[in-house]
Amino acid sequence: VNITSFNFDKSKVHSILKDKQGNIWLGFFQKGVMIVPPVINNFKYMGYKSSTHNTIGSCCIMSVCKDHSGSYWIGTDNDGIYRIAPDGKQQAHFEQRPGIGHSVSSTIMSICEDSDRNLWIGSYRDGLARLNPQTGHCEYIYLPDKDQKPVQSIYSIIEDKHRQLWVGAMGAGLYRINLDTKEIYRCPSTANGFEYRPLSNILHNSWINCLLCSTNDKLYIGTYDGLGCLDIPTMDFVSTYEINRLLQGDVIYALYEDLHHNIWVGTSQGLKQLNPQTQKVREYTISDGLPSNSISAIEGDANGNLWISTNFGISRFNPGTQTFVNFYASDGLQGNEFSKGVSFASTQGEIIFGSTSGITYFNPGEITSPNKNPEIR
């Protein structure tokens, strides 16, 4: 194990011990003890804690995407957007330039590459834009709110199989853009709640965090107050009273559809499994093995496992055995706190999670379960 790759003050190490399990114990002057396990998982990292050259600054990561060429697009809080080559080298850094109307916004909340390889970005203050990946020039798209004022905060962007771009805004609801005709539609919103008005064009909450297009042509909408479900062919919101009753009040940060078409919902109060056929919801919390009830993002691997980032580590969940395996900084992560809603799974199977200190990315097949806790007497 190369212990120098870990983030600690090497000048403060006063003693070193290797135990029977292969763990290396480091004793620090007035700083306590650090344990380095014998097998470090192949969690890769980009960020300011890197022992090599930092390519993405020191700001919190707010969005991430991997494009058709394999380049990483990383949106930050107050430092624009970075383009990183597959080998980890910085290709571009586009940041806000005061007085220049077509420069990128400072805080990028969402990134999406559409089927035409256009790159769309949603910002915290400047709304929706289409980004030229070579020049950084932004074409801002006017999205009107109910008062015809431009929408500012875009937290989620996704394309469906009908070549429609869905845009989730904070406080302004849901928008649909036809990529062929360029027409823009706004889905109405009301406080009455779609669960009380089946098959009506109503969304329960206009503060949208995340979106998911399912295989059965439904758009799931995670909001600050529960879950919405839109039938895309008919453009009607589907009433699911029991689901709304169980999820209403939850802040939803993440949505994922598994290989069996269950919808997994990451909330501020734990992980929820939704079966669209039975309309049943199952809940998982710390008492079931999660490292934290505050779920940040959810992705899946080819074996049907879920990978869940939280505000206290990453968890691998096997739905078949109903077991969680948790990973922390001591298992090779560069930190335990991950950003809300920031994740991406590439077509090659790589999973990426954004955090407060950079991005963690890995191939699930290269990650092994951590050793048992070392014996302390």
Residue ranges and their predicted role:
Residues V1-R377:
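Carboxylate-rich, polar loop motifs that coordinate divalent cations or form catalytic acidic clusters
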